[in-house]
Structure formats: C-alpha cells, structure tokens
Curated annotation (Swiss-Prot):
The EC number(s) this enzyme carries: 3.1.1.96
Originating gene: dtd
Sample GO molecular function, one term: Ser(Gly)-tRNA(Ala) hydrolase activity
Membrane-spanning segments: none
Organism (species): Streptococcus agalactiae serotype V (strain ATCC BAA-611 / 2603 V/R)
Entry protein name: D-aminoacyl-tRNA deacylase
Subunit: Homodimer.
Reactions catalysed, as given in the entry: glycyl-tRNA(Ala) + H2O = tRNA(Ala) + glycine + H(+); a D-aminoacyl-tRNA + H2O = a tRNA + a D-alpha-amino acid + H(+)
HAMAP family noted in UniProt: Deacylase_Dtd
Length: 147
C-alpha cells in the first residue's frame, strides 16, 4: 500500500457536484493498493496512521495523533500512486492492484480505520473532485513495503 497523508483544517470530496464526504480538522488519505498487499499491510497502515504524532500540542510541537485531537479522516482511493513513468510520456498503472482486489482492500482499510477514528470516503473508481485546506503543510508518504 502507498498512502499519501495530508494534515488538513478541512476537506471534502464531490462527485458530479454532490459532496459525498467532508471533514474538519484531520487527515486526507490518498490510498493506493498493490497486487501483493495483504491484510497485514492494512493493519500496519491503520496502526501507523492512527498513532502518528503529526498534530501540534500546546507548545507547537508535533506531538499529538489523530486520535488525540479527535480528528477525522477523509479517505480517497488513488490507483495513480502506482504510476510507472519510466517509458514514454503516458504513465502505466500496472503496479496497482486489479479493481476487484483494490476495492475490497480499500473497504477493509476504511472499516479498520473507522474502529479508531471517524472516516469519510469518496467512491471507489469514481471521478472525484477533492478540495482541502492543508495545515502546515504536512504531507507524509507511507509505503507498507518499507516497514
């Protein structure tokens, strides 16, 4: 799994001008699933995301987790994280899981995450418009292959 984690003050996702998910202070996650990902990768990612101390405490130090601040997550499926740009000018996405597995794992990931924090989602496979106000900005790349 590759997950882009962005700390935000607010974010929303729309499909055809209808808002389908929105959050206030929290995290936007762009989630990519690889063919070789397992449920252990999901557990690892959920543990890291919910425990990562990337929110400021009263002294301005990044010392609080998403759970500590009672923040929310906006989770967006993002197969393009596996773009291969080595040849030519059009990216190939053969490194992404097939849609059936990716959808299944994306759902499991969101369900596991929801056991710890409030989760809003986009719609798997849809053309979405994501709006967000970055906080910091703080942007972190989590790759479960680099445990």
């Amino acid at each position: 799994m590759k997950i882009i984690i962005q700390r935000v003050n607010q974010a929303s996702v729309s499909i055809e001008d209808d808002v389908v998910g929105s959050i206030e202070k929290g995290l936007v996650l762009l989630v990519g699933i690889a063919p070789e990902d397992t449920t252990e990768d999901i557990a690892y990612a959920v543990r890291k995301i919910t425990s990562m101390r990337i929110f400021s405490d009263d002294e301005g130090k990044m010392n609080l987790s998403i759970q500590d601040i009672k923040g929310s997550v906006l989770s967006i499926s993002q197969f393009t994280l596996f773009a291969d740009t080595k040849k030519g000018n059009r990216p190939a996405f053969t490194g992404a899981a097939d849609p059936v597995k990716a959808n299944q794992f994306y759902d499991i990931f969101n369900q596991e995450l929801a056991n710890h924090v409030s989760v809003e989602t986009g719609q798997f496979g849809a053309d979405m418009q994501v709006s967000l106000i970055n906080d910091g900005p703080v942007t972190i790349v989590l790759d479960t292959k680099n445990k």
